[in-house]
Regions:
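Glycine-rich, Lys/Arg-enriched anion-binding loops that position phosphate/diphosphate groups
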Residues: 193-194, 198-261
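Divalent cation-coordinating acidic motifs and surrounding scaffolds
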Residues: 21-207, 214-217, 285-295, 301-303, ...
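Charge-patterned, long linear interaction tracts outside catalytic cores
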Residues: 240-298
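Bacterial Sec-dependent N-terminal signal peptides
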Residues: 1-24
Length: 382
């Protein structure tokens, strides 16, 4: 009997070591991004562009490295200018504090609705500066993106003072004006960006995002379906979070196959981590020991098994997940090469939209403080 338990202990020890060896260890660096959307009546097109580009943006962010290591990606979401919001709060609402839960970010974005109101840019920027747990480390990348189409100086909160405060905390405020470039300048959108050392963009928010279909999309999304079957929700929130994972796949697919493909690629990367509800990620991150968990907390597939059987099944499913992630990552490289070649042939893809504005400024600022963009072919599965 002693020998039997020794064997189990050895298997568990080896399995635990294998998890620690294959998991990219964040080096303490963070990439923090707060997105502030005008949700007044005229901004439906802006929200549509964001839905179409959110996974492309996250893919760009997840390719950043600092001294070869993977930074933590945190995203926050606010909306402002909606008449359904509280006047006493300057028509500003926090949808989501800084979080690493990428499915939740998608859920909140797809739930946004528009309604006429007063757009107070200074107020929503101030709110994000006050509410969020911004890093104080100058090596962490901290970005605010505010998008809208009304004069920037509306409301009682002085935008100049707020943008200056952001600059003093090494937080770049980037402004995206939905309309004519010069009109945005006249309405002070460029001024805010200049004060905070951020970037100013203008976009046509009513223009649909153009996606390039590739021969690799179908295969990538097929592997994503297989990847989903390696996720096992545990504890009180496990099942609802698993359901939300599938719902956000569906939301992405409702935009286009290309958008779903971008999401599938994100799910092959270290940035897509779900240790709060997925059993494999929970053990992978070191916070859970499957042999000490109650059966009631475990997903159905793991109930009633011996410790040795639980560890063996977890190892099997972890291996399956890594294989699917690797396949997706390999195809993602081929897909990107195809897209790059197609872009070189076409002239209809040169205009800025919400996604290109965010990606361009984010990569520029990241490089300025020492981040590099790692080729996706070398991105290590989480």
């Amino acid at each position: 009997m002693k020998r039997f338990f020794s064997v189990i202990s050895a298997v568990i020890l080896i399995f635990s070591q294998s998890f620690s060896q294959i998991t990219p260890v964040p080096n303490g660096r963070r990439v923090q991004v707060a997105i502030l959307f005008d949700t007044s009546n005229s901004m439906d097109g802006l929200i549509d562009q964001a839905k179409a580009k959110i996974w492309n943006i996250i893919n760009e962010m997840s390719g950043l490295r600092y001294q070869g290591q993977v930074p933590m990606i945190e995203i926050a979401l606010y909306d402002y200018g909606n008449s359904g919001l509280s006047e006493s709060e300057h028509y500003v609402r926090q949808q989501l504090a800084l979080t690493t839960d990428l499915d939740l970010i998608s859920q909140k974005l797809f739930s946004l609705t528009t309604n006429g109101g007063n757009e107070y840019c200074g107020a929503v920027i101030q709110k994000s500066l006050q509410d969020l747990n911004w890093s104080t480390n100058p090596l962490d990348l901290k970005m605010i993106y505010i998008a809208g189409n009304e004069p920037f100086n509306q409301g009682t909160i002085a935008y100049k003072e707020v943008c200056s405060t952001a600059s003093g905390r090494n937080i770049y405020v980037n402004t995206i004006y939905c309309g004519d470039y010069d009109q945005g300048v006249r309405e002070f959108w460029k001024d805010c960006a200049t004060i905070s050392k951020g970037d100013y963009f203008n976009i046509n928010s009513n223009e649909a995002v153009v996606h390039i279909a590739t021969p690799y999309d179908e295969s990538i999304n097929s592997y994503n379906d297989s990847l989903n079957r390696t996720y096992y929700g545990y504890g009180a929130i496990g099942q609802s979070k698993k359901s939300n994972q599938l719902m956000q796949d569906a939301n992405a697919a409702s935009e286009s196959e290309a958008v779903k493909t971008e999401r599938s690629i994100v799910k092959s990367k270290a940035a897509y981590s779900n240790e709060s509800w997925d059993l494999i990620d929970a053990v992978d991150k070191g916070g859970k020991d499957i042999t000490s968990m109650d059966d009631a907390e475990l997903p159905t597939e793991f109930k009633g098994k011996t410790d040795e059987e639980k560890v063996a099944l977890l190892e099997e499913k972890k291996g399956e997940r890594e294989r699917y992630q690797k396949k997706i990552a390999e195809l993602a490289v081929e897909r990107q090469n195809y897209i790059t070649a197609e872009k070189a042939k076409r002239t209809d893809l040169s205009k800025d939209d919400f996604g290109t504005s965010v990606n361009g400024s984010l990569m520029k600022r990241a490089k300025e403080i020492g981040y590099q963009k790692e080729n996706e072919s070398t991105d290590t599965p989480k």
